[in-house]
Structure formats: structure tokens, C-alpha cells
């Protein structure tokens, strides 16, 4: 019975994520419209609200192209696997009851994000197009560079809370958010999240001016739609993770979802206002700035834990000596 309830809960979570992805695309088009002093989609239904469903019908009913020189199987499997990973990683979202509560949620998240690199690489390689391959290679180099800092920051928090289980973030932030005490780290995490999800100013995988849309240039119809559904599901997940780690992990509170929406809005806002980085500056930022920053924080948290432990030991032994 418990397994059936968990299964129903997982299906509901996936359906809610997919619906959220649809409306996130609408929010993005509306926000970008107002940033560029225009209306955005407003013709379909009331204020353009049913627009995402019309887009989905249009994309999935268009003709599927078959590039003659592509590696057929990997070309079609990679968008499906990409979306599967983006939905699968939601399983580590912290719940109190009736859904999987991973004791190793942090580790599971790192594994899923590491696998996400391969889908972009295979999608670029299997298209047998030079532009797609270049886009794939740039995406792999970028993601590897940023995942090192991402993993180190995640490890810092694991040392701080003493568990891989995400639900511990809720217990540690009942009285004060980590955003207040670790503000520089939150800014770095947000920047790494932008790079991880291939968003502006780090969207080198799909630079239109340089790579003719990048690794997805040969995709059309359903394959193209699946790639972008995976991207927007990742944006929502990284927004959720930011709220869990820094803004109090109160998943049963309506305010949590308001915070999640705001962080998603920040992703879109960054796209509307910031220009694309230069590639060498991106690498400099990843290896010279963020890596040293995250290593320093990791060492600080380890040292902090050792200091606390030694202080407790000193109190314990001093009490023993006083008793004797």
C-alpha cells in the first residue's frame, strides 16, 4: 500500500512539474516581452494563458525530420533521456510523508546532474553536424567546469548539516535562513545554477550568433520540444534547490512556492538583461574564482566542525577532571 501511495505521489509530482514547465515558458515570454517594451503572447484565450498548450500541440504535430547522416538511435534517444533525467532528479525533493525520502538525496542530485552532460554531448555528436558538435563540446566543457564548484558547495552544506538528506535543511533553518549567514555562497550558487542550466549569460551551448542554435540545430518537432522541456524542468529544479538550501525548506508552506517562483523569475530576468559572457572569461570565472571560493568554504566548514567537536571534548574532560 505504501509503495502504491509513493508511486501515485511521484506521478503527481511529475505531472505538476510538466504543467509548471508549460507555464514557465509563458512567464518567460511575458517577462521578456515587457523587458523589450511589448506585450508578449496575448492572442490565444484570456491574456494568452492557453498559449503553452497550443505550442505543445503545434510542436508535436509538426513533421519529424530525419537527417540522413545522423546516428539514428542516439540522435532520438538523447532528448528522451534528457527529459527523463530532469524529471527523475525531482525524486530528491524533501518530503515528510508518503514519498521517497532519500537519505542520500544530495548524492543523488550530484549523480543526476553529472549524467546530464552526456545527453548534450551525445545529442551534438549524433547529429553529425559541425555546429551541433561544437555546441555539444562547449556545453560539456562548461558543465564540467561548473560542476566541480557545485559539488564542493554541496559538500560544504553536507558537512554543515551533517547529512545527505535534504530534509535536514528544514530543521537547521527553522529560526534563520542560510541566505542570511551565507550570502556570498548563495550568489555563487545562483551563478553556478545559471551555468548548469545553460542560461544567459552562460548559454554557450546554444549561441545563435556563433553556432546557429548550437547542439539542437538538427532537432525539430518532438525532439526539439523535449530538449527545451528538460531545460525548463532543470530551471525549476535548481530554483527549488536554492529555496531548500538557502530560503528555509518549508515545502508545505505556500510561501515556499512564492520563493520558488521568484527565483525562476530571476533566471528569466537574467536572460532579458545580461549579455553573453566571453568563453575564456567563463573558464577563468569557473577555475580561478569559484573553485577557490568553494574550496575555502569547504575547508572553513570542516575546520568549524573540528573546532566545535574539540571544544565539546574540552568541556567534557574538564568536567571529568573537576569531578575527580
From Swiss-Prot:
Enzyme Commission code(s) on record: 7.1.1.2
Coiled-coil intervals, chain numbering: none
Record function comment: Core subunit of the mitochondrial membrane respiratory chain NADH dehydrogenase (Complex I) that is believed to belong to the minimal assembly required for catalysis. Complex I functions in the transfer of electrons from NADH to the respiratory chain. The immediate electron acceptor for the enzyme is believed to be ubiquinone.
GO molecular function, one term: NADH dehydrogenase (ubiquinone) activity
Lineage: Eukaryota, Metazoa, Ecdysozoa, Arthropoda, Hexapoda
Membrane topology according to the record: Multi-pass membrane protein
Localization annotation: Mitochondrion inner membrane
One GO cellular component, as annotated: respiratory chain complex I
Keywords: Electron transport, Membrane, Mitochondrion, Mitochondrion inner membrane, NAD, Respiratory chain, Translocase, Transmembrane, Transmembrane helix, Transport, Ubiquinone
Family: Belongs to the complex I subunit 1 family.
Transmembrane segments: 3-23, 77-97, 104-124, 150-170, 174-194, 226-246, 250-270, 297-317
Main location: mitochondrion
Keyword hit for Cell membrane: no
Gene that produces this protein: mt:ND1
Protein's UniProt name: NADH-ubiquinone oxidoreductase chain 1
Domain of life from the UniProt record: Eukaryota
